[in-house]
Amino acid sequence: MNIHEYQAKALLREFGVPVSRGVPVLKASEAEAAAETLGGPVWVVKSQIHAGGRGKGKFKEASAGDKGGVRLAKSIDEVKQFASQMLGATLVTVQTGPAGKQVNRLYIEEGSDIDKEFYLSALVDRETSRVAFVVSTEGGVNIEDVAHTSPEKIVSFSVDPATGVMSHHGRTVAKALGLRGDLGKQAEKLVAQLYNAFIAKDMALLEINPLVVTRQGELRVLDAKVSFDDNALYRHPDAVALRDESEEDAKEIEASRFDLSYVALDGQIGCMVNGAGLAMATMDIIKLYGMSPANFLDVGGGATKDKVAAAFKIITADPNVKGILVNIFGGIMKCDVIAEGVVAAVKQVGLNVPLVVRLEGTNVDAGKKIIRESGLNVLPADDLDDAAQKIVKAVKG
């Protein structure tokens, strides 16, 4: 689960992390009071959306002006002007796609006198099963681009959970960033604070880009992105309260209500599969035959008829879906339950695109019989390869 920048900074402030002062606003009329509270003489007006690249982004509406989603204001009048232009407008960035995202919140922040910019993040390293830090002298840019063009400028290390963060971890960061003396000590302290926040709040990602050195010789977090581990949210009702569903895909929200593992993608073939491994294999073979999946959807091993029906409705609600592939290998999951759910959903919402169903495993004959006797226009498949070829052919016509 992601949260907004201003929420992330408020959370980090609780752990002593040095962040700039700021005030979130939901209405343009609140901008003046926010700016006066901060005092100036320079303010930064930041769009709050769950996507990166805001500064280089562009608004769709001409009324929002030709500047990006992060703007420097040198007067309170400019703060008010930018707030009026940006709130309610649609910001398009490299991460939003062409549709963009509507800006419903702004963060008015005090300006910083920046000397240097760095990159620093903490994340879960799946290879070592530890929290890892990633550090780079290239701040304020996309870290993936740095990894591609200048990998030697990235330093990473993991933290042993038995010891937790230690002073040498902070010194590693300081050395990687060329920070000495008091700034080196600040880096040591910051790494410990970030690690403590990461562990205490069960984060999946904590990204600071950029981390800056001000001309006053202070380390400061200028931008922060926090993502929580969804599986640990039950332990953090305070984090759940920060959720902004308007920033999330409506289909993913609906899927979460039925405990379905669903991720929206950009393709045209909807997929309903049981098991993450089989789901990924299904997506791969669709790509192999020349098309792209519209989603990742794992119904799990113990799905009920209602859960399967909900999954099917979520897929059909996507206007980009031009065909659907149901691929089930029944172990704990029974093929007849899948069949009943699919039939029930189709009868409720209709079927306007080709549907290919491949069933194998527990109660497969009963499942195939339910599909066959339903009267629905369903293309049966004998195996995964056959299913993929049939749905691609049906969609391409």
Curated annotation (Swiss-Prot):
GO biological process: succinyl-CoA metabolic process; tricarboxylic acid cycle
Pfam families: ATP-grasp_2 (PF08442), Ligase_CoA (PF00549)
HAMAP family hit by this protein: Succ_CoA_beta
Encoding gene, per UniProt annotation: sucC
Family, per entry: Belongs to the succinate/malate CoA ligase beta subunit family.
PROSITE patterns: ATP_GRASP
Domain ATP-grasp: 9-254
NCBIfam families to which the protein is assigned, alphabetical: PRK00696.1, sucCoAbeta
Residues annotated as binding substrate: N274, G331, I332, M333
Reaction(s) catalysed by this chain's protein: succinate + ATP + CoA = succinyl-CoA + ADP + phosphate; GTP + succinate + CoA = succinyl-CoA + GDP + phosphate
Keyword terms: ATP-binding, Ligase, Magnesium, Metal-binding, Nucleotide-binding, Tricarboxylic acid cycle
Quaternary data: Heterotetramer of two alpha and two beta subunits.
EC assignment: 6.2.1.5
Residues bound to ATP: K46, G53, R54, G55, E109, S112, E117
GO molecular function annotation: ATP binding; magnesium ion binding; succinate-CoA ligase (ADP-forming) activity; succinate-CoA ligase (GDP-forming) activity
Gene3D superfamilies in alphabetical order: ATP-grasp fold, A domain, ATP-grasp fold, B domain, Succinyl-CoA synthetase domains
GO cellular component: cytosol; succinate-CoA ligase complex
Binding site for Mg(2+): N209, D223
Designated name of the protein: Succinate--CoA ligase [ADP-forming] subunit beta
